[in-house]
Design a protein with these regions (language model features):
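Residues immediately within or flanking Cys/His clusters that coordinate Zn2+
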Residues: 19-29, 63-73, 186, 278, ...
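C-terminal amphipathic alpha-helical segment
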Residues: 252, 260-297
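Ferredoxin-type iron-sulfur electron-transfer modules in oxidoreductases and energy-metabolism complexes
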Residues: 1-14, 37-65, 69-71, 79-114, ...
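Cysteine-centered loop/knuckle micro-motif
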Residues: 31-32, 75-77, 362
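Iron-sulfur-cluster electron-transfer modules
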Residues: 19, 36, 46-188, 192-224, ...
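A broadly conserved sequence feature marking short terminus-proximal activation segments
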Residues: 1, 21-45, 285-289
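Cofactor-cradling patches in redox/metallo enzymes
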Residues: 157-248, 282-299, 303-395
């Protein structure tokens, strides 16, 4: 036993000291979607931390299976930031020279290219080829100055499976005649570095680079389609600058909520459909944005929303967070499959989300399980309904 283990861990981050107040109620284990993949349940892990059983805790590696979804944080009666302490354990593991194959490769890619896939910067924009734009129209996407910047994020930019998300947002913004542009030199927001055991301070260069790129555009608003990017911009980046951000960061659901109204599809003859909505953990639970996506759906004629058993800030994770797909893809798929089961219970024809990674993870699980449900991002569904009516977006 190492009786200093608890004290050292408690001092690493503000709030960590609350682990000393854990009463072993088990709400964390009952809330954890990843506990099946842990040799020590969350409850047992925290007890071992309290008892100074450092070797057992660090040897279990269960902290790498945490999706950092934050449901345990929300339900803990003592208000212990458990997902934050999971990240502290990853940092301790990293400082001790430990490594995890999937994480190591991703961090190497980020160092070399500024994105998780190690791709050339130009490849972030291959999805634009399918928009059917003229050379002039394509060039306008990268104009020097604009009121709005669309920060795409690595998953939407580099995974063809979800290329429809940035395509849909660009189409909608162009319909709205929004003065917007993309960042030619966009980097990853940096979350995979923090989630990879390097700590929040490791995001400084990502913050400085992306903030400077946005400010060079003179933008007042940044729209994101990745909730994790949103979280990093609003909760982590401000720590590295001595003044407030000069621009407002919004998820696309917030931006479009006031623009997409019932006028869009009034009197339309589109087919009536039932949809269910999966709340991304970072957007719904951590940033408390649950109404905006639903208000957009309410503004679409012929659309009925059927809620899953766990929704809103109590929504279950898709299994795609916390770098889990890099460290334990099988567990990630199993978690996503359970969420598909929740969606099927509603009888909905569509399972919608507003996160690029959720869309990937859930669609992979639906295909694997041959589930009879269409997985789409809210943006893709919105554009589909607008195009079915042949009407312009109301503004």
């Amino acid at each position: 036993m190492n009786f200093d283990f608890l004290d050292i861990l408690s001092r690493e981050k503000e709030g960590n000291e609350k682990i000393k107040t854990c009463i072993q109620c088990g709400s964390c284990t009952g809330s954890c979607v990843a506990s099946d993949g842990m040799s020590l349940s969350p409850r047992k892990l925290w007890r071992n931390v309290q008892m100074g059983m450092e070797a057992d805790v660090m040897g279990s590696l269960g902290f790498w299976n945490c999706t950092t979804c934050g449901l345990c944080d929300k339900r803990c009666p003592r208000g212990i930031p458990l997902s934050q302490i999971m990240l502290s354990l990853r940092e301790k593991f990293d400082r001790a020279g430990g490594s995890v194959a999937g994480i190591t490769q991703t961090l190497d890619n980020l160092r070399k290219s500024g994105n998780i896939m190690g791709e050339d910067a130009a490849n972030r924009f291959l999805w634009i080829d399918n928009l059917g734009l003229t050379e002039k129209e394509r060039g306008e996407l990268f104009k020097g100055k604009s009121e709005v910047v669309y920060f795409i994020g690595c998953v939407g930019a580099l995974f063809p499976q979800v290329g429809g998300i940035p395509q849909s947002l660009v189409k909608i913004l162009r319909k709205l005649k929004t003065d917007f542009s993309l960042l030619e030199n966009e980097w990853c927001c940096g979350y995979p570095v923090m989630g990879g055991g390097k700590g929040a301070d490791s995001l400084r260069e990502y913050a400085e680079h992306n903030i400077a790129a946005i400010e060079s555009k003179g933008a007042k608003t940044v729209i994101v389609s990745c909730p994790t990017c949103y979280y990093i911009f609003n909760k982590v980046y401000p720590k590295f600058i001595d003044k407030p951000l000069s621009f407002n960061v919004m998820h696309y659901a917030e931006y479009l909520e006031g623009l997409i109204t019932d006028k869009c599809l009034a009197g339309s003859e589109t087919k009536s459909v039932t949809v269910t909505y999966h709340d991304p953990c970072d957007l719904g639970r951590k940033l408390h944005i649950t109404d905006a996506p639903r208000n957009i759906l309410k503004g679409l004629s012929g659309v009925t929303l059927a809620e899953m058993r766990f929704s809103g800030e109590e929504g279950k994770c898709c299994g795609g967070g916390g770098n889990l797909e890099m460290t334990n893809s099988e567990l990630s798929l199993n978690i996503a499959s359970k969420r598909i089961g929740d969606a099927l219970e509603t009888g909905a024809e569509y399972l919608l989300s507003s996160c690029q990674q959720c869309r990937r993870t859930l669609q992979n699980a639906a295909r694997k399980g041959r589930a009879r449900i269409k997985v789409m991002d809210l943006l893709e569904f919105l554009l589909l309904r607008l195009e079915e009516t042949g009407k312009e977006v109301a503004k």
